[in-house]
Amino acid sequence: MAKQSMKAREVKRVKLADKFFAKRAELKAIISDVNASDEDRWNAVLKLQTLPRDSSPSRQRNPCRQTGRPHGYVGKFGLSRIKLREAAMRGEVPGLKKASW
């Protein structure tokens, strides 16, 4: 299982992303607006850089439900590749079978 601190850190990232979602969207809209002045766009970039890093949704990871493994995550099943293979070999995943050709 994943450490409790890793789970807490992920929860913190989700909360920060929700909290700053509107602010980030507003600043990104100014940055991508071609009609905005260069000074306004530059100020928006600087303000975006002052926001917490963990408020960016791209910092979030999808951990495996069984083990908490953050890499090799298969989103359709919510499991890491290792646990998905084990479950498939036991026949616990409906409609999933080992490939053979």
From Swiss-Prot:
Record's subunit section: Part of the 30S ribosomal subunit. Contacts proteins S3 and S10.
Residue numbers spanned by region Disordered: 51-72
Record bears the keyword Aminoacyl-tRNA synthetase: no
Sections of the chain in a coiled coil: none
Segments of skewed composition (Polar residues): 52-65
Species, as recorded: Buchnera aphidicola subsp. Acyrthosiphon kondoi
Keywords, in A-Z order: Ribonucleoprotein, Ribosomal protein, RNA-binding, rRNA-binding
Family matches, as HAMAP family: Ribosomal_uS14_1
Function: Binds 16S rRNA, required for the assembly of 30S particles and may also be responsible for determining the conformation of the 16S rRNA at the A site.
GO biological process: translation
Oxidoreductase is among the record's keywords: no
Cellular component terms (Gene Ontology): cytoplasm; small ribosomal subunit
GO MF annotations in UniProt: rRNA binding; structural constituent of ribosome
The organism's place on the tree of life at top rank: Bacteria
Name of the coding gene: rpsN
PROSITE patterns: RIBOSOMAL_S14 (PS00527)
Family: Belongs to the universal ribosomal protein uS14 family.
UniProt name for this protein: Small ribosomal subunit protein uS14
